[in-house]
Amino acid sequence: QPEYLPDLDPLVDLWCLTFRAMPGDVPDGIAALCTQFWTQDIQYPTRASLLDTVRRRFPASFLPLVRLAHALSGTAPDAPSPDTVAAMMNALAHVSSVALILPQRTAGLGLWETLDEAGAPSVTYRLQADMPVAHTQMHVPAGTHGVLISPSGQAPAIVLWQLATPISAWHILHDAFVSSVVPSSSATDPASLESDSPTLLSPDWENDSGSVGVIVAELFADVLQTEEALGEALLAHLGEQEALVPASVALVQAGLASQPLDTRRVYAGYRLLMALLPLRPNDIWQHVRSTNVLIGSPGHVPLLDASVPRSALLTHERRTGVFTGTFCLLDLLYALLEHIQSTQFVDPPSLVQVQASVLARAIGWAGYHIWPDHQQWHYADNPSGWMHLSFKCLRLFSAVLSDPCFLAPLTAKDPPAAVLA
């Protein structure tokens, strides 16, 4: 076992530069490089040594595995690579060890014992009771043996536990991401703040939980968008406790409510919602219907909502001249509209009516606050940014106006296209 590395970033950076598609790269070439790794290089210990190391050091070293998995997935914008994503998913689904911080608050409870083993390279431990994995729903079973891999005397102490039955890193990624963005019922209890801190799982979360959550959300979004069958397989693998939809909405809300507004969180949350839409549409409608996320503002829809709402996201991006979040929001609105149009004659009319009214509010906001004067705005990142904004608005409005339901006479049960009008 290699010595614990407190900072794997330089090595991971090198691999990410090699395997992760950058602007201007040929996506097929990157996918072919990742295919070679998963079909050939993985068989040689020296070539797979970094992946093996970050798997063994997970989750105490949290980000290295996430970043490396993202790079080795072979995905690029608009260029999915199902075979390499499937290989990466499988590698993370079977992890035979976990590196965990020894929880000092339980040191006096006899949760573990130290063993005196001749010739052992470091302090060895044996669990005398099940040990929960902080910030997750998982436990390391009693009887598991571990070895200290952090330098002796260094705090926090990190122990590598060898598991008799492999576990899934996806469950740890999911649980840590969800618990970092979705408020827990005990979040207001001062006595629970220490146990709820994500730094108990990994020092990577210290002072940077927002960034870590964004990177995990981006990984999930890329996998789910690659192929619907792979997305369904991943959600099924996560099981009944899967909660990516509320976590996505919470990530957007957190980004919109932060000061200054965190566009990266907002963008990552919208992307994950779009990736989940074909797989969990009803959950998404349930969680967005009472919020302002579809107009780019935090909080909930007021009971008396007669005025056209304003958007914290649009206000922020008009000031900066960079409209990354607004572009993604308009893409999400278009995806939601496509979903309504494809299911409006299948879903119950009452459900479709609610969905249409929710979307009508958001499209009305776009027509009132974006369309009239977006050509006069300042675009810092791209002088032709107004053209991109025009295209996304026109695509959205055209999809509404071209709906065949407009040709039908209006009744007491108006079709969704009429509501959107």
Spans of model-derived segments:
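Extended alpha-helical scaffold regions
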Residues: 1-421
